[in-house]
């Protein structure tokens, strides 16, 4: 019946004694956001990760190698693994079977207390009990001791005692649940792509584990993807560099442990200028970095400088490379596993364990140094690339000074073309990046000057995918944006200094407008990515048509809407249609009413759901390999709607 269950006879003494009980579940249904972040679509998907994380823990401990996630009819989720099966013996303190305790008591699980798992994933670690509390129905089947055990729950409450329902020659756990619509009022429908992206990431981060995702909601169109990477994060780096030109064929790869900290690093340089560094701790993407990232950067800079000087590629001490120089054109992934990870930072995605810094530094520096001496040609290319980056950095320093604002209140240094807003509260302020001066004039007249700022952009901005920072900072339009935003750029970037929490790209609904949008998004992604990650970047949706019938005006945003409206309207009185070719054709009142008024407008928020997908798409659209770009356009032309 279940493909992911194990034939292996796991006899390790993972039993009820290793399940600790800390507190009850009463609060979970009252304040679900405290436990899963939110009750939005994101929180809904978080339920799946809590169950999958438990299966990954079994795999990390060496007891499972297959996990299967199925979206069943009516958006039930089924997660199956071939681990040892959750313990079913009586848990001493509670006097109930361990599986029931795990599913009904908050923080009761093998990951608390250190007896069950050396390393466990999951940001909240709140586990199965929270999923149970927030599900209208949940069922568990445990294959253990040659017996199949079963129990069912409603909103976290057991419906009957754990019972034996059959015999088995396999081991493992099956959990089925349906999220409670009373809690998840926004949606209880799962997004296949959201699940697929994280499952692929987990397969990269846990080499050798096979994770399968299947969607059975449409019987005639069952979809399935299975991921299994023996190369782990090495394969991940190769995928990220797929559309780039690597300087060395094989990624540099290290997988070692020291002081009970497991360190896995893969790094490959390419001929481009952007740095792509992804860091993970216990499978959690540490967006804000942390001590593992610090240790890696410190070792990388020290070893490259040491090699450059000793091999005489760099002549003197004053030629030393900065950290930023050594990372130009680098794609790297750092993944550590730690028994007690400490997460800090605004979003709890920054690793705080100080001991990790030294371990990563030591393990990586020894391995990297050996690689450089064994591959002198590659080593020379990497060092020389750093030297070129250093020269560009010196040139960029001058340009960068122009863009640095002394403080968010230093209005004197703001660009002359900027029509700023009067409010000094970034949370309510928004800036519209408007294509062309003529449209800029209309938007300035039609805005709410208290909270809306306008920055007209003249002509095309630079394609940053093909340029170094010094050239980028010499581009007038880019300099004006950096100064207006107040955040700095690249290594100097500080999200807390953002002067606006909404940055709205407002371009014409034509091919040129689409190109400018792409250029701006490429710049934000490569040099101001936290703006996208924080949800500050939006795309305005100006209307494409105005349909007039008598005194009635209708603004229409795409051809589909237009066809629908035409079919619904009476033929009399006669109506006329005007197509807007550009923002400049609208007067100030029309622009305000259709595109800028928060009461009526539609804004498209730019989200970064999949780092791999985004990186490859920007490289494909804006990079040097024409053939890949042509193929991408041919494959996606049918979906393209340049009118947004």
From Swiss-Prot:
Positions marked as site (Interaction with DNA): 460, 463
Subcellular location: Cytoplasm
InterPro entries reported for this sequence: DNA_gyrase_B_C, GyrB, HATPase_C_sf, Ribosomal_Su5_D2-typ_SF, Ribsml_uS5_D2-typ_fold_subgr, Topo_IIA, Topo_IIA-like_dom_sf, Topo_IIA_B
Cofactor note (record): Binds two Mg(2+) per subunit. The magnesium ions form salt bridges with both the protein and the DNA. Can also accept other divalent metal cations, such as Mn(2+) or Ca(2+).
Toprim domain mapped to chain residues: 429-543
Record-given protein name: DNA gyrase subunit B
Primary residence: cytoplasm
Originating species: Staphylococcus aureus (strain N315)
């Amino acid at each position: 019946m279940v493909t992911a269950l194990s034939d292996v006879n796991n006899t390790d003494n993972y039993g009820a004694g290793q399940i600790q009980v800390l507190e009850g579940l009463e609060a979970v249904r009252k304040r679900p956001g405290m436990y899963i972040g939110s009750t939005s679509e994101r929180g809904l998907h978080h339920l799946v990760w809590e169950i999958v994380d438990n299966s990954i823990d079994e795999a990390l401990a060496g007891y499972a190698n297959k996990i299967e996630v199925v979206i069943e009819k009516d958006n039930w989720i089924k997660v199956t693994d071939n681990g040892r099966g959750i313990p079913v013996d009586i848990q001493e303190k509670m006097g109930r079977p361990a599986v029931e305790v795990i599913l009904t008591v908050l923080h009761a699980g093998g990951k608390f207390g250190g007896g069950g798992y050396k390393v466990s994933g999951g940001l909240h670690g709140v586990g199965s009990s929270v999923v149970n509390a927030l599900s209208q129905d949940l069922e568990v089947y445990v294959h253990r001791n040659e017996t199949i055990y079963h129990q069912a729950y409603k909103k976290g409450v057991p419906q009957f005692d754990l019972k034996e329902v059959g015999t088995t020659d396999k081991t493992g756990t099956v959990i089925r649940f349906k999220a409670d619509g009373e809690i998840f009022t926004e949606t209880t429908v799962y997004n296949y792509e959201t699940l697929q992206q994280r499952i692929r990431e987990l397969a990269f981060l846990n080499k050798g584990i096979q994770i399968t995702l299947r969607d059975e909601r449409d019987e005639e169109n069952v979809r399935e993807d299975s991921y299994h990477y023996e190369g782990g994060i090495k394969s991940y780096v190769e995928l990220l560099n797929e559309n780039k030109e690597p300087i060395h064929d094989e990624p540099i790869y290290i997988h070692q442990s020291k002081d009970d900290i497991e360190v896995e690093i893969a790094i490959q340089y390419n001929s481009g200028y952007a740095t792509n560094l992804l860091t993970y701790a216990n499978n959690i993407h540490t967006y804000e970095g942390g001590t593992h990232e610090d240790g890696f950067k410190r070792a990388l800079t020290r070893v490259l400088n040491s090699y450059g000087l000793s091999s005489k590629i760099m002549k003197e001490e004053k030629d030393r490379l900065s950290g930023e120089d050594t990372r130009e054109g680098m794609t790297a992934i750092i993944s550590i596993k730690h028994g007690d990870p400490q997460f800090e930072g605004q979003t709890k995605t920054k690793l705080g364990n100080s001991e990790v810094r030294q371990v990563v530094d030591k393990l990586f520096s020894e391995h990297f140094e050996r690689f450089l001496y064994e591959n002198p040609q590659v080593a020379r290319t990497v060092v020389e690339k750093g030297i070129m980056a250093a020269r560009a950095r010196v040139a960029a320093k001058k340009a960068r000074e122009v863009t640095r604002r002394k403080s968010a209140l230093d209005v004197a240094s703001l660009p002359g073309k900027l029509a700023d807003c009067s409010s000094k509260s970034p949370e309510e302020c928004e800036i519209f990046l408007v294509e062309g001066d003529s449209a800029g004039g209309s938007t300035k007249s039609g805005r709410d000057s208290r909270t809306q700022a306008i920055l007209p952009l003249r002509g095309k901005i630079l394609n940053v995918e093909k340029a170094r920072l010094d050239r980028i900072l010499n581009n007038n339009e880019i300099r004006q944006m950096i100064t207006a935003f107040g955040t700095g750029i690249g290594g100097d970037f500080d999200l807390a200094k953002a002067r606006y929490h909404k940055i709205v790209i407002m371009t014409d609904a034509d091919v040129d407008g689409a190109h400018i949008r792409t250029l701006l998004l490429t710049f934000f992604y490569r040099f101001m990515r936290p703006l996208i990650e924080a949800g500050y970047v939006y795309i305005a949706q100006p209307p494409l048509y105005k349909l007039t019938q008598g005194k009635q005006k209708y603004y229409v945003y795409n051809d589909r809407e237009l066809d629908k409206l035409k079919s619904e309207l009476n033929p009399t009185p006669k109506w006329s249609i005007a197509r807007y070719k550009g923002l400049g054709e609208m007067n100030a009142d029309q622009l305000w009413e259709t595109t800028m008024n928060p009461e009526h407008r539609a804004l498209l928020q730019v989200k970064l759901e999949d780092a791999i997908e985004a990186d490859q798409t920007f490289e494909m659209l804006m990079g040097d390999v024409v053939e890949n770009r042509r193929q991408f356009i041919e494959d996606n032309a049918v979906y393209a709607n340049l009118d947004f």
